[in-house]
């Protein structure tokens, strides 16, 4: 069967039967099936969100998505970036799972933190119940400072810190040739300085 046919079947069997009912929002835990097509996903995800909102006729229903966890040897970083672009739509939230995944298994066993993050985000977005910090740091912007890049983050709670308290060691930079190499990175307040 073609991909279009499969998508139509999924919609017709899983979503269309729910249209007559009132709902409070969507939780979307994307599998890795599309992870090899991040550029296409940048179009598909926002289109799906917009389409479902139109069909349910309830305005900007909250849409909460789970960003793919870390997996070694893949290109999921580009897909995670594509997923994050959906945050540009109104009333869309994201639960980051990169820190709770298993680098050798795209289907991590520990899903409790992901559920807790979705719960806190839903409490804030859907029920307007302020819960304080409900997510980890979110990239905001960057600026070039000589031969270094200063990355700014928001939603930093009590400040940026590494998970294990050690120096940051998973950053990479690329030159004009497009080849990535390991980079040094340090935390400065709510910023990360990379070179």
Regions found by a protein language model. Give the residues of each.
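Loop/turn elements at helix/coil->beta-strand transitions in domains of secreted/extracellular proteins
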Residues: 21-25, 58-64, 88-94
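Oxyanion-hole/transition-state-stabilizing segment in secreted/luminal serine hydrolases
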Residues: 13-36
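Solvent-exposed beta-strand/loop surfaces of large extracellular or lumenal domains
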Residues: 173-193
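Surface beta-strand/loop "capping" patches
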Residues: 113, 120, 124-167, 185-187
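Active-site rim elements
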Residues: 36-38, 101-111
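Alpha-helical scaffolding within the catalytic cores
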Residues: 7-17, 43-53, 76-84
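Substrate-gating cap/lid alpha-helix
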Residues: 68-100
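Short, small-residue-biased leader/transition segments that mark boundaries at the very start
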Residues: 1-5
């Amino acid at each position: 069967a073609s991909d279009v046919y499969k998508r139509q079947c999924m919609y017709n069997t899983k979503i269309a039967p729910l249209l007559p009912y009132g709902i409070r929002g969507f939780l979307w835990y994307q599998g890795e099936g599309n992870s090899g097509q991040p550029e296409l996903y940048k179009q598909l995800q926002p289109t799906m969100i917009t389409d479902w909102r139109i069909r349910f006729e309830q305005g900007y229903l909250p849409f909460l998505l789970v960003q793919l966890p870390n997996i070694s040897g893949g290109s999921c970083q580009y897909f995670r970036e594509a997923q994050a672009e959906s945050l540009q739509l109104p009333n869309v939230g994201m639960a980051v799972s990169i820190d709770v995944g298993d680098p050798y298994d795209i289907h991590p066993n520990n899903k409790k933190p992901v559920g807790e993050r979705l719960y806190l985000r839903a409490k804030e977005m859907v029920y307007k119940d302020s819960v304080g910090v409900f997510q980890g740091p979110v990239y905001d912007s960057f600026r070039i400072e000589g031969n270094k890049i200063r990355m700014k983050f928001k939603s930093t709670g009590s400040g940026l810190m590494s998970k294990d308290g050690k120096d940051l060691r998973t950053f990479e930079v690329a030159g004009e040739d497009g080849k990535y190499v390991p980079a040094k990175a340090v935390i400065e307040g709510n910023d990360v300085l990379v070179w």
